[in-house]
């Protein structure tokens, strides 16, 4: 019986250990190396990830899941006032970030532990596997997986908690609808603070699909976006219609066809 997304993920790791999990620009990471990285990561407490869209952000999210906690990705461009409102409401136990973003707010003021990736020596990290496994054994499928923040149009952003079961159901529906076979190369254009990113993450974990992290800025440069899709051989996208309309209106597919894209 599957109780968390980690159960699916570890099945995938066993099945395709050397398959590419995530690519970003010239960086890439296999499923096996994820396990190695995640083994050193810090029940059911929110942990903020304040990083740009990157492999480090994906690894942080999965590391938080492995520690049986809840990840909440925040935009590094978030205004300070909005960020402070989120932190006050969320009360995270920790923030994972880097030198460039660690001083955006005074984390200590809110009782948040700062984990600076630029200061971590992975060779000195140790893991209590017995403790982690004990936590895993206590998980149930209605435990929270991640938190997504609303736009905050009413003044204060609200945190929406999504549990494991909701992703089980979503991926099951998507699998029945699109017939995923694990050979998908997903062009992930949405920011990591959007819910669709979490769905793409689960497709990677559940089905063994590869995620290609596309810079969100490419959305306003359709030709460059299509060139990137060609270069990375992307065959699955889940985008807002606006981008597709722009591509169609400019007739870009006639010049930059995407033959590998699934219909």
Which role does the model predict for each range below?
Residues 158-185, 195-236:
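Conserved AMP-binding/adenylation subdomain of ANL enzymes
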Residues 42-45, 182, 188, 256-260:
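His-Asp-centered acyl/peptidyl-transfer active-site segments
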Residues 56, 70, 146, 185, ...:
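Structural signature of beta-strand start/N-cap positions in the alpha/beta core
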